[in-house]
């Protein structure tokens, strides 16, 4: 499970996820990538499911980079507990995703394998994505 080793404060306010991504919106390491098209929130289980789908499809050839890290705590109260009595405990760690953010990058595989792997990884994410390549920074398929 991806989560910070330590934080200054245990809990955060919810905040609002608006706008588009300017940082982390271009390919930096690999030749193919998965780019978010809409707003969303990704947790560590979804990142791990995408990573497993990529590595199984690529059959341990090539290299995978995970460009996101869940650093925002999400709190929840237990079921059957009345409102009040303070904020709930931390349930999971998430990251707010804005349109244009690169989620995964891969290299060292051919075009067909890259598209197949990234399509499977995209199915594990809760928001729409598109596949981009180094040659064309816009949509590949």
Swiss-Prot record:
Residue ranges annotated as coiled coil are: none
Where is the segment annotated Disordered? Answer: 1-20
- Tell me where on the tree of life, at the top rank, the source sits: Bacteria
GO terms for MF = rRNA binding; structural constituent of ribosome; tRNA binding
Q: Please give the biological process terms from Gene Ontology that the record holds.
A: translation
Keyword Phosphoprotein among record annotations: no
Q: Which Pfam families would you find in this protein's record?
A: Ribosomal_L16 (PF00252)
Family named by the database record: Belongs to the universal ribosomal protein uL16 family.
How would you summarize the oligomeric state and partners of this protein? Answer: Part of the 50S ribosomal subunit.
Q: Which PANTHER family does the UniProt record give?
A: 50S/60S RIBOSOMAL PROTEIN L16 (PTHR12220), LARGE RIBOSOMAL SUBUNIT PROTEIN UL16M (PTHR12220:SF13)
> Mind telling me what this protein is named?
Large ribosomal subunit protein uL16
